[in-house]
Amino acid sequence: MTTKTVKLLVFLTLLVHGIGHLQGVVSGLGVKFNENSKTQSWLLKGSSERVNRIACLALYLGAALFGIMAALSFRAFLLPHHIWQTFAFISAIFSTFCLVLFPDALAMFFNKIGAIAVNLLIFYSIPFNGMFPSAAFND
């Protein structure tokens, strides 16, 4: 695989990961994707529906924004290139909290599996593997 192909795959993965979390934002706004879609967190059961929806909205919005910013930063579009890993890591943290606290806010089970896979890739690649191997991105 060429360097350009790897860069394109990383960019698209980060972008789709960020955009995918907008489903949770829509759920936080009260739109139901299906009969199982809900914004009630198992941790916030004693709180009102409004508090749950605001928490869902805020967490998924954070994951979406940081995911999109990571993708844009990776391509050095509007944001500096050197901070893309920080944005990706923050997005993965927000995403993990979203998936743990509000597992039914995403439209389909496939969306959850995809988000978990990208989060695991980010958690492995960035802090535990000494950042992404720079050799993969050399031109």
Residue locations for each model-derived region?
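Membrane-interface extramembranous regions
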Residues: 2-139
